[in-house]
Amino acid sequence: MSFDAKHFLKTVSESPGVYRMLDAEGNVLYVGKAKRLKARLASYFRGALNAKTQALVSRIEDIQVTITRTETEALLLEQTLIKEQRPPYNILLRDDKSYPFIFVSDRHPYPALEFKRARQKRGDGRYLGPFPSTTAVRESLSLMQKIFRIRNCEDSVFAHRTRPCLQYQIQRCSAPCVDYIGREEYQRDIDHAIMCLEGRSEQVTAQLTRDMETASQALDFEEAARLRDQIQQLRRLQERQIVDTGDGDADIFALAERPGGLCISALAVRGGRMLGARHHMPQNGLDLTAEALLGEFISHYYLGHEREIPAEVITALPLADSDVIQAALSERAGKRIRLAHQVRGHRAQWLRLAETNAEQHLTTQLANRSQLAKRFASLRDAMQLQETPTRLECFDISHSHGEATVASCVVFDQDGPVKSDYRRFNIEGVAAGDDYAAMRQALTRRYKRLTQDDSKLPGILIVDGGKGQLNMAREVLEDVGITGTHLLGVAKGTTRKPGLETLFLETVDNSLALDSASPGLHLIQHIRDEAHRFAITGHRQQRDKQRRTSTLQDIPGIGPKRRRELLRFFGGLQGVRQASRDELARVPGISAQMATTIHQALHG
């Protein structure tokens, strides 16, 4: 793992908030919340961890944090981000097409809230979701059953009950199976549960409050007490703070600037709920004032992209040319856009959050940049170079016993990974398992298109391998006419532990030994690990694609269209394998005879 947790934790706030763990490609692995961010994040990097957490931590390349005022706000934001970004470690690596739903039948007089693996095409009810995970569905179902006493039994059980079950005894069901509740009253509970699941719990609370007052005036104190308990449970659930105000769409921009860099944080609020923060590190090449820089950034942010413009844009500073910017935004949006920097109430709280997040992100980025500069300088000194390199490239090969061989090229400059310059190469025409030939093909394809004067030529080319790979890399550069690029080979030690690598320079007889605490070695390990992860991710995608399609491709009569329909209908090849003949025949374009053919081909 190349992520420097010790260094990162020095920059983290003790405030409550939400954190996002990212992999080498910038994909969100996990979203979590914490009452104290620093303590929670530190717990991932000390002590015994379970297998799942160890697997997660091993893939971390970056952690982004968003500060909130309270833990409740962090919880609300966490759920928003999980539903929006669907990180794999929050959803237990579920396939994209099989996110769970909550289903409410419109055919049953007393419908249950049902767990469904996927949305069915027939219109026999209402689907709520999708939810980010099975756990999220089950927790939501449990909560709605507890508050509104919705039944959770199967229809077949419901039809044959003659007395209430245990769920009624523990006040988690109103026993509609034995007519302890009328159809109209039960439907009202269902409607309230649906409204809560759709995020309209405030409307439910208001209605229940009116019902409670009516019951009290009618001297029905038992009903009033029941409604009071429901209201209290809902209010404990809500605890609405500034992250979920229930009012307004707005984007909020704040700028933090210090010697060495600046950060602009953009908070998006929709329907009163904060959807998250994005951080930008623009270059102030013209040395503009903060007001002018923020104005130019906002203009480019909206007018330079096809982006939704909310009714209100709030800024921490009065913008230069604010009237012009407001007019342009209004014209682009086709409605009047309010541009404000002096705000009160929850808008002022939003703004303070944006300012806090900008400061926090800038602190982290400047610390990272300083550390990276030390690593580049250390590598320069270790390799005895006259100048500090400005660009590194590293290659790695990944395959499974020669299957689906993929080469990766990752790029670092003095600000860190340059992910827009990353490349993958699907290797073809080489013997299975021949890593030398695969590396030669990847290097040739990469550098034959570059000229000696190209600004994207690396100062140092790193290959994951020993003497053989280094020799081959030198031959490729000579063949394509590239000079001036230094070569570095990284051979894993016998135990394959970090810090025990053998490094080879330029010629195979020139080895380099670096202390395990060397910042230069840490840089090499970082880019090597990044190349490895980028390669293995591409390899797995390629391998899975080949395996997924080849199984169905071998079945007579199954072309690309039917193959797509099968995979879409069942959420993947595993679902197709588990389907019965009758279930296969329900797929559009699959006849009963074809279903039998598919079933026999998959099961023999």
Curated annotation (Swiss-Prot):
GO terms for cellular component: cytoplasm; excinuclease repair complex. One of its GO terms (biological process) is nucleotide-excision repair. SMART domains: GIYc, HhH1. The lineage of its organism: Bacteria, Pseudomonadati, Pseudomonadota, Gammaproteobacteria, Oceanospirillales. It is found in: Cytoplasm. Residues 202-237 form the UVR domain. It holds the Pfam family UvrC_RNaseH. Interacts with UvrB in an incision complex. Residues 14-91 form the GIY-YIG domain. The UvrABC repair system catalyzes the recognition and processing of DNA lesions. UvrC both incises the 5' and 3' sides of the lesion. The N-terminal half is responsible for the 3' incision and the C-terminal half is responsible for the 5' incision. NCBIfam families: PRK00558.1-5 (NF001824), uvrC (TIGR00194). Keywords: Cytoplasm, DNA damage, DNA excision, DNA repair, Excision nuclease, SOS response. GO terms for molecular function: DNA binding; excinuclease ABC activity. Belongs to the UvrC family. This is UvrABC system protein C. Residues 538-557 are annotated as: Disordered.
